[in-house]
């Protein structure tokens, strides 16, 4: 037994709308312990929807459709499913009454086109929609086959799933075991290098371990199948500990942890403070830090020193060094870090100066060249050189990708501070 998610909507194929429904349903299926191996997105075309159904029923017993339940001519999900299985559509008086009442509550009269939403395959049960006009169905068109349909509006679909589909599936015996996962996060190591280090864990049966790439980072998903979350965590815990020991400082957090949140907790626990000076990242580092609730406990503030006059005037960077070495240099990065630390009276100062591109690079200072400065207690200061323009993420080079170079710069600065706090 397995489930397949089928999301209907040309707007999804065109990329006009992010397909959050598939992500939500995949997570929900895991919580119920229902195997799920395929997802499909298909446009509002009956022939192509039928092709998708033909493939899906050859490999899954539970088909979950989202989208295509509205009143317009291109909303074809229910009628196409019924036609595929050779079932007539019947009008549901209960749905007509529900839609009529909802229109009346809004001071409107139901339009003739909305009657289309009351047509369901003969023998199907209604999935009530508490907020919208598009109900769903639960239907068993043949033995060992269950079909669910939901509207594409996420808020409506979520509520209908939780209030009707989940109880139904549990009544069928699902939910006795769950699939529970923890995402281990790593920075400063590539996916292949990490996979090589943890090769012995990649073929475990339960829990399973699988690497995947995040935005500039690498993650390992450790998943266990067990009767409860606590039982799954007990299976995962020893494997997680062993992987952390192998990865060392390259491991930084789990699940919803971010580099900013981890650094914040380290600063808070030590009673220390941080300030930042940014050039090419233009405030991104400060934004990451202040996205964390309570960051005012340790983050004093920052200076966006985009122009050299600000570097010299507000941070005290030597004008001769700016003229001779340029703003993108180790010396300037160190002076920026020390300058912001001194002026804001913090324990630590972080600085970033570089060439984010896509223009502005030279042969000696190419796009992606970044210097990060770190000033610590007393007169401690150091700088680190990176060339993010030579990196690749999957098949995509970062050179010329201004947004991604800035992201890598800010995250790497946080990672440098994290490692320093852990190893002093």
Curated annotation (Swiss-Prot):
InterPro entries per record: CinA, CinA-like_C, CinA_C, CinA_KH, Competence-induced_CinA, MoaB/Mog-like_dom_sf, MoaB/Mog_dom
Domain of life: Bacteria
A Pfam match: CinA_KH
Family: Belongs to the CinA family.
Matching HAMAP family: CinA_B
Name of the protein in its database record: CinA-like protein
Protein source organism: Nostoc sp. (strain PCC 7120 / SAG 25.82 / UTEX 2576)
